[in-house]
Amino acid sequence: MSKKQQAPVAQKPVGKQQQVNRKPQDRPGLTEDEIEEIKEAFNLFDTEGTGRVDPRELKAAMQSLGFDQKNPTIFNMIAELENEGTDIDFDQFLDAITSKLGNRESRDGINKIFDLFDDDGSNSINLNNLKRVSKELGETMTAEELAEMLERAASNGRDISREDFYNIMVKRTF
């Protein structure tokens, strides 16, 4: 079967609802492992096994875990889902996340990711931006390690421009 042709999408019953299994290629820019990690996080909140979660409960749980402070980007995505007012399934949850992040292989998607780093609107990624993202992701990197990353990635040695970031993201290693 060619890459353009896809097998019919299988449906599995989940409680009284139907859940559609999507293939990883349905989410450009996400690997199968990344989709699986997102699914595991979603399932933590699907305590009744219905395949659906209430965004209000998800937001409250994330807030109680400090996500509004530790990872405001993800928290705000969940808060936007809350405005819909109905339970969401995994595909809706994944759509919300991927629409915010975009396709990491397109310039537009890479620009969206850049904007997640550039929270101060300086149109560059500086040491403070890297420290914040490192903390949000739970990484334990020293200021020296982050400064070295900047030095290597930035064409001027101080901060990463949008163009520097794009070049880093599209660089392929073999």
From Swiss-Prot:
Q: Which SUPFAM superfamilies match?
A: EF-hand (SSF47473)
Query: Where does the record place the region Disordered?
Result: 1-33
User: Where does the UniProt annotation locate this protein?
Assistant: Cytoplasm, Cytoskeleton
Chief subcellular location equals cytoplasm
Query: Mind telling me which CDD domains this protein's record contains?
Result: EFh
**Which residue range or ranges hold the EF-hand domain?**
33-68, 88-103, 105-140, 141-174
Q: Does the keyword Calcium apply?
A: yes
Q: Which GO terms describe its cellular component?
A: cytoplasm; cytoskeleton
Q: Does the keyword Disulfide bond apply?
A: no
Q: Which InterPro entries does this chain map to?
A: CALM/Myosin/TropC-like (IPR050230), EF-hand-dom_pair (IPR011992), EF_hand_dom (IPR002048)
- Keywords in alphabetical order, please: Calcium, Cytoplasm, Cytoskeleton, Metal-binding, Repeat
Q: Return any one Pfam family short name.
A: EF-hand_6
Domain of life of the native organism: Eukaryota
- An example molecular function term from Gene Ontology annotations: calcium ion binding
Subunit comment:
Monomer.
Concerning its family, UniProt says: Belongs to the centrin family.
Q: What exactly does this protein do?
A: Plays a fundamental role in microtubule organizing center structure and function. Component of the infraciliary lattice (ICL) and the ciliary basal bodies.
Q: Know the name of this protein?
A: Caltractin ICL1e
